[in-house]
């Protein structure tokens, strides 16, 4: 089995690190600290130019829930067009109704737009907030998505192993179940083996200090608990260790 390793990134430095670390696909975002929002057009175009592996743009216009209004849908549609114009390979989205069901009515035109532009579609972890995952899985398959990113409705994929395995069984090859949330080199092999997933999603996040020589500590750009002089980035080494753990599992299985 060939495992796919998708890395979510929100800056160009992390893109380079993810590629060097062995990622097979990129989820392109902004604001990973908020769960990932739509990346800037500039980052999309940069990824489209430099990435030798597929890159999918997050289409999420704001933080918070996944219940969207018409003006937000217009923004999402334009962002899908931008992803296409930037030569990306796909988009990542997810919409729910207020009752926790999949918003099929509003998802369909966005997914059809993406398909008309030759883009693949991943349904993201809005799935983990749905009221009936078994029914939601069937609806997402019918919508034509390639895969679902999910933690198995748990706080992280390790805790969601049992549900992930059930989803893989139910999907029966009709859609890929991609495990995500809290995946690292220490647990990735166990998660893959126990669930049967062949796609795994992680950030491999670390931080590095700012290169600024002058720091005005009394001025803050964001929330009080955010350090403006610590830069979150993807760790090439942590990602390589995760990729190697999967390769070792693959060699044992084959």
Curated annotation (Swiss-Prot):
GO cellular component, one term: cytoplasm
Compartments, record wording: Cytoplasm
Alphabetic keyword roster: Cytoplasm
Annotated InterPro entries: CutC-like, CutC-like_dom_sf
A GO term for molecular function: copper ion binding
Top-level taxon of the source organism: Bacteria
Main subcellular location of this protein, as a coarse class: cytoplasm
Coiled coil residues, start to end: none
Family annotation (PANTHER family): COPPER HOMEOSTASIS PROTEIN CUTC, COPPER HOMEOSTASIS PROTEIN CUTC HOMOLOG
Record-stated family: Belongs to the CutC family.
Protein name: PF03932 family protein CutC
Lineage: Bacteria, Pseudomonadati, Pseudomonadota, Gammaproteobacteria, Vibrionales
Primary gene name: cutC
């Amino acid at each position: 089995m060939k495992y796919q390793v998708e890395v979510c990134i929100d800056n160009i430095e992390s893109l380079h690190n993810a590629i060097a670390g062995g990622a097979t696909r990129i989820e392109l975002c902004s604001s990973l600290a908020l769960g990932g929002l739509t990346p800037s057009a500039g980052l999309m175009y940069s990824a489209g130019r430099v990435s030798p592996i597929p890159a999918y743009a997050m289409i999420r216009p704001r933080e918070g829930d996944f219940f969207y209004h018409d003006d937000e849908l217009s923004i999402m549609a334009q962002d899908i067009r931008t992803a296409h114009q930037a030569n990306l390979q796909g988009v990542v989205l997810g919409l729910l109704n207020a009752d926790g069901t999949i918003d099929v009515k509003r998802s369909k035109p966005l997914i059809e737009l993406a398909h008309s532009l030759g883009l693949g579609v991943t349904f993201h972890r809005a799935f983990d907030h749905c009221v009936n995952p078994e029914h939601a899985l069937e609806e997402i398959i019918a919508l034509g998505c390639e895969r679902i990113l999910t933690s198995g409705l748990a706080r992280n994929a390790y805790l969601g192993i049992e549900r992930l395995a059930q989803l893989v069984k139910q999907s029966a090859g009709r859609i890929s179940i991609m495990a995500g949330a809290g995946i690292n080199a220490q647990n990735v092999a166990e998660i893959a083996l126990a669930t049967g997933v062949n796609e795994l999603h992680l950030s491999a996040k670390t931080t590095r200090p700012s290169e600024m020589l002058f720091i005005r500590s009394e001025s803050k750009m964001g929330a009080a608990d955010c350090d403006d002089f610590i830069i979150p980035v993807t760790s090439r080494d942590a990602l390589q260790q995760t990729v190697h753990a999967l390769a070792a599992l693959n060699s044992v299985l084959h």
